């Protein structure tokens, strides 16, 4: 008899950030230099006080330096760095303090607007603090009065970074060493939302007064074609339109264009901030009501309400000469304007699957 399977899936497993990996490997390398102790695993304390043990792939001396490495375990999160080797090299310095260097596969900041200055290695503030605190605690325990130079590396990081927002943000040469809690929460989307905020910050700091937030590649291509916007002004928001609109309260870029597929824009028009199907759905009767507002007869309203998809509803309206695309964009525009500051000019485009514009509102 075949073994029964559980009706409920097992809980998703959390992982550890690249910042935690860099902390563990830096600590292990420094400990080898100061004590001669070669570890197979090290304990680190995360920002909220939790202690975790991280297994090391190696811990060895290389000339006057030491290096240690660990495999990034992102748990059940679809993280681009899952399984990557993160390793740190540590060198002792005469003067106290801790310096950071971008090693192989770790990027360097080349544009203003991020939390790190131009020219700095892309090792974010919390990982820097974690590494510094662990090394200082070790130094105090060993009576060591000098400093440390920490070089963080990610094997294959330069290629992995091409799958992230780093090139668009002006972080070149590799990945960022990230983490605020030290823990990767599966499907938390926190890193993606942070990259949206960073993209807006970088565009604003570099003097761009017009940005286009797009749901995907087709909408980005449309914005390039319509406005000729450079990469730095194109914000890949995916389903997180709320992350864009709310951030403009802090960073009021003068002109915002929102562009997405007709179905996604229909959800925005209904007041949804998260456009993913897990969190919002297309309300076909509402589309029928909006069509009625601009002249659709009862038969067309019924057909739209009973349509299989939003695209079919749009096609039915188009065949009857009803500009449903423009009406939906107008409702989306009204909702977006209710969220952002009054001084931000907003416009909305809806596109079909081929990237053709099927509706617009607020366009200058």
From Swiss-Prot:
Alphabetical list of InterPro entries matching this protein: CbiD, CbiD_sf
Molecular function as annotated in GO: cobalt-precorrin-5B C1-methyltransferase activity
Associated pathway: Cofactor biosynthesis; adenosylcobalamin biosynthesis; cob(II)yrinate a,c-diamide from sirohydrochlorin (anaerobic route): step 6/10
GO biological process assignments: anaerobic cobalamin biosynthetic process; methylation
EC category: transferase
Enzyme Commission number(s): 2.1.1.195
Xref: Pfam families: CbiD (PF01888)
Catalytic activity: Co-precorrin-5B + S-adenosyl-L-methionine = Co-precorrin-6A + S-adenosyl-L-homocysteine
Keyword vocabulary terms for this entry: Cobalamin biosynthesis, Methyltransferase, S-adenosyl-L-methionine, Transferase
The keyword Transferase belongs to this UniProt entry's keyword annotation: yes
Family recorded in the similarity comment: Belongs to the CbiD family.
Protein name, as recorded: Cobalt-precorrin-5B C(1)-methyltransferase
Name of the coding gene: cbiD
């Amino acid at each position: 008899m075949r073994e029964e399977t559980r009706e409920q899936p097992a809980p998703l497993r959390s992982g550890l950030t690249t910042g935690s990996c860099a902390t563990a490997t830096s600590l292990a390398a420094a400990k080898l230099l100061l004590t001669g102790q070669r570890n197979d695993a090290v304990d680190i304390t995360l920002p909220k006080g939790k202690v975790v043990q991280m297994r090391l792939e190696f811990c060895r001396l290389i000339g006057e330096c030491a290096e240690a490495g660990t495999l990034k375990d992102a748990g059940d999160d679809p993280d681009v760095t899952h399984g990557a080797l993160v390793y740190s090299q540590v060198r002792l310095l005469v003067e106290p303090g801790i310096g950071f260097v971008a090693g192989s596969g770790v990027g360097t900041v080349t544009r203003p607007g991020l939390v790190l200055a131009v020219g700095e290695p892309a090792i974010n503030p919390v990982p820097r603090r974690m590494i510094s605190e662990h090394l200082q605690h070790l130094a105090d325990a060993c009576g060591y009065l000098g400093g440390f130079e920490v070089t963080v590396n990610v094997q294959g990081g330069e290629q992995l970074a091409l799958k992230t927002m780093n090139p668009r943000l002006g972080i070149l040469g590799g990945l960022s060493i990230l983490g605020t809690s030290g823990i990767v929460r599966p499907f938390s989307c926190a890193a993606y939302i942070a990259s949206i905020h960073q993209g807006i910050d970088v565009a604003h700091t570099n003097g761009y007064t017009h940005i286009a937030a797009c749901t995907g590649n087709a909408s980005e291509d449309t914005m390039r074609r319509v406005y000729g916007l450079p990469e730095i002004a194109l914000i890949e928001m995916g389903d997180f339109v709320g992350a864009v609109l709310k951030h403009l309260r802090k960073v009021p870029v003068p002109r915002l264009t929102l562009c997405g597929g007709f179905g996604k824009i229909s959800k925005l028009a209904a007041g949804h901030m998260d456009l993913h199907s897990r969190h919002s759905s297309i309300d076909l009767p509402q589309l029928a009501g909006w069509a009625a507002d601009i002249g659709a007869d009862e038969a067309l309203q019924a057909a739209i309400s009973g349509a299989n998809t939003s695209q079919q509803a749009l096609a039915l309206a188009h065949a009857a000469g009803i500009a449903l695309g423009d009406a939906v964009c107008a409702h989306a525009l009204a909702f977006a304007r209710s969220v952002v500051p009054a001084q931000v000019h907003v416009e909305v485009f809806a596109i079909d699957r081929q990237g053709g514009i099927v509706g617009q509102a607020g366009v200058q």
